């Protein structure tokens, strides 16, 4: 499997140009040049920058993004430019499925936006990669998403044959959806997934999961049988089947290796890089338990050369910048 060179150790700048107030003051102040310098000094090689379509409805939107890319280049950081939300579609509960996959008009706005982005940024292909859309939700969108993604790749390829284009699948970029990505692959396509498994651990106490008790806490090395029992009691999704051989076991690097095995095999067969664009642990979790999770998943990322960008640098309920990470941050980054 080919490595995604230059995009091996990354961090998300979530909440800056996406999932935010969409006001100039926020765009100007949430992240600055010093933050690019800091993540470079920490040891990251790239930043994933989520952007919502609203950014480009701001008269200064492209200016803000230009400045971000200039700062990344200044500090020798590569960038994944991720379209996090588009017209008529968001992965967020309550915002989401507002006609994008059914409306040719909304799809045309998606193509028009990527046409603008491609024209403006393919000249930066030495350090910028494009991610077409964040977290397609339902499997029912699989076929139409493949059509949209394929058409968008062809559009971008009119401007550049070598810029890296990152494509994920349904169930919020689940690793199990890699097998159903069906586009006209070329050597500069990157297969993308996200991983927050076991969700009951990484999202313990998460307020946005409606059935999650806000005071719920769980240690990482809980048996899978208990994970399943608790998840069932609270009606919380838990995708562990492909990673578990014995329900008496607890999470380990082998769990993640089993979970990723099919996607790794597909990437090897297609000779394409595999990239985990989001993964992380909510800030409510005990910091030593958090470290255990990161060390296990990183062992598998390193073994197979899987590029990755943890979620997220500042705030956003994950807050890797927070001082609670000061003693262990270097152990996580490696």
What are these regions (language model features)?
Residues 104-250, 257-282, 296, 303-309:
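Active-site region of glycoside hydrolase catalytic domains
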Residues 2-5, 12, 16, 227-239, ...:
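Domain-start "cap" segments at the beginnings of catalytic or binding domains
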């Amino acid at each position: 499997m080919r490595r995604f060179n230059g995009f091996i150790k990354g961090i998300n700048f979530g909440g800056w140009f996406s999932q935010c107030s969409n006001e100039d003051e926020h765009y100007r102040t949430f992240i600055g040049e010093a933050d690019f310098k800091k993540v470079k000094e920490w040891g990251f090689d790239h930043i994933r920058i989520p952007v919502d379509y609203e950014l480009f409805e701001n008269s200064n939107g492209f200016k803000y993004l230009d400045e971000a890319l200039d700062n990344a280049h200044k500090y020798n950081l590569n960038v994944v430019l991720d379209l996090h939300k588009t017209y008529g579609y968001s992965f967020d509960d309550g915002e989401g499925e507002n006609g994008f996959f059914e409306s040719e008009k909304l799809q045309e706005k998606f193509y028009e936006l990527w046409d603008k982005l491609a024209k403006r940024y393919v000249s930066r292909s030495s350090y910028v990669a494009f991610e077409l859309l964040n977290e397609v939700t339902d499997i029912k969108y699989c076929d139409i998403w493949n059509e949209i993604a394929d058409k968008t790749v062809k559009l971008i390829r009119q401007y550049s044959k070598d810029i890296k284009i990152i494509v994920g699948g349904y169930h919020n970029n689940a690793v199990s959806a890699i097998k159903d990505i069906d586009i006209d692959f070329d050597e500069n396509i990157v297969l993308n997934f996200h991983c927050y498994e076991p969700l009951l651990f990484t999202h313990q106490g998460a307020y946005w999961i409606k059935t999650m008790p806000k005071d719920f806490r769980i240690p990482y090395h809980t048996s899978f049988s208990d994970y399943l029992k608790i998840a069932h009691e609270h009606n919380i999704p838990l995708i562990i089947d492909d990673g578990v051989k014995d329900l008496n076991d607890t999470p380990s690097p082998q769990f993640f290796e089993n979970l990723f095995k099919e996607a790794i095999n597909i990437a090897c067969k297609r000779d394409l890089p595999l990239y985990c664009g989001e993964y992380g642990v909510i800030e409510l979790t005990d910091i030593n338990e958090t470290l255990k999770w990161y060390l296990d998943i990183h062992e598998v990322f390193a073994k197979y050369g899987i590029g990755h960008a943890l979620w997220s640098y500042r705030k956003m309920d994950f807050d890797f910048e927070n001082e609670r990470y000061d003693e262990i941050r270097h152990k996580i980054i490696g």
